[in-house]
Amino acid sequence: MEITASLVKELRERTGAGMMECKKALVENAGDIDAAAEWLRKSGLAKADKKADRVAAEGRIATAQAGGKAVLVEVNSETDFVAKDENFLAFTEVVANAALNSDAADAEALKSVKLDSGETIEERRAAVIAKVGENLQVRRLVRIDSANNVAAYVHGGRIGVLVELKGGDIELARGIAMHIAAMNPPHVKASDVPAEFVAKEKEIELAKMSEKDKAKPAEILEKIISGKISKIVNEVTLYGQPYVLNTDQTVEQAVKAAGAEVIGFQRLAVGEGIEKVVEDYAAEVMKQAGLA
């Protein structure tokens, strides 16, 4: 069968693969466009396997929401350049929407979720890898599903937050989500802070004190330490931090003024916890030349 330009174009539109790859696929499969599409998918999977050991620490946070049900997903690429590629961006939206419409509890479960096209997320990932030429990973998925106010906020594609707020309104929930994106509090309130953390901070503060302060009466010493610990706890709790949208009050004051309560939140930032590999090519060349 003759491999026409229109046939190559049709396969390219269907798969998104490059023109030469589409032509090769059609030649390999005697012009059968369905077989060629499958061949490209398998080729994509092979390429994905070859790139699997490459560090993917860039990427994007995407969200999808329907009422009180919302998700955040982190999809990683190797470079910031690919993180801005239209194929990559489209894939992150596909992943977020698939997560929202499934009951997948985590990124691993999300891999096997089927799309309307019949592909799984994992198969689509492999196809996008074939297009962009980098290792891509669907790394994390978090969700909130509640009858309370739920706000989803993504800042610059790099940081995403979900907030569940009992009472108040969605505007307040969104404001709190923006605060969490900016300030990254580890905990909601003081009672959530682990006792081990507080005990360790007390040790540190005591060690930092001068001998003169340590010689003060026990009750005065306790007040000094308690004041320092209270300040530290405020710094690591959402409720204790000055509200970024109105620094004249804390988040707790803003929430209580609305008769509300923060039930919980989720925050994701691109690449957090991933050790990036920094290549020193000059040192590598010198090493190979026996000069280092």
Swiss-Prot record:
Main subcellular location of this protein, as a coarse class: cytoplasm
GO molecular function annotation: translation elongation factor activity
Disulfide pattern: none
SUPFAM superfamilies tied to this protein: Elongation factor Ts (EF-Ts), dimerisation domain (SSF54713), UBA-like (SSF46934)
One GO CC term, this protein: cytoplasm
InterPro entries given in the database record: EF-Ts_dimer_sf, Transl_elong_EFTs/EF1B, Transl_elong_EFTs/EF1B_dimer, Transl_elong_Ts_CS, UBA-like_sf
Keyword set, alphabetical order: Cytoplasm, Elongation factor, Protein biosynthesis
Spans annotated as Involved in Mg(2+) ion dislocation from EF-Tu: 79-82
Record's subcellular location: Cytoplasm
NCBIfam families given in the database record: tsf
Listed PANTHER family: ELONGATION FACTOR TS, ELONGATION FACTOR TS, MITOCHONDRIAL
Family statement drawn from the similarity comment of this UniProt entry: Belongs to the EF-Ts family.
Function, as annotated: Associates with the EF-Tu.GDP complex and induces the exchange of GDP to GTP. It remains bound to the aminoacyl-tRNA.EF-Tu.GTP complex up to the GTP hydrolysis stage on the ribosome.
Protein name (record): Elongation factor Ts
Taxonomic lineage from the root: Bacteria, Pseudomonadati, Pseudomonadota, Gammaproteobacteria, Lysobacterales
